Regions:
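Oxidizing extracytosolic/periplasmic lumen-facing domains
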Residues: 1-69
Length: 69
């Protein structure tokens, strides 16, 4: 797991964030990825606003593959 930061978010008509773009750094390399949020994550959409810190899980063999946890 690693720390990341939300850099962009897409909201639905009700204002719930449904998709995020985030960045994280591993071994000096910066990665950027996007993910659709689960229903549970959407219920806490204030936690996924741009600028918020997040925790991501990544594949150690392919660190560009990650998910928001």
């Amino acid at each position: 797991m690693a720390d990341g930061r939300i850099i962009d978010a897409i909201s639905d008509n009700d204002g719930h964030i449904t998709q995020v773009t985030y960045t994280y750094v591993l071994a000096g390399v910066q990665y950027e990825s996007s993910q659709a949020l689960s229903d549970l994550q959407q219920a806490r959409s204030h936690d996924y606003a741009p600028g918020k810190q997040i925790v991501i899980r990544y594949d150690p063999r392919r660190p560009a593959n990650s998910i928001v946890v």
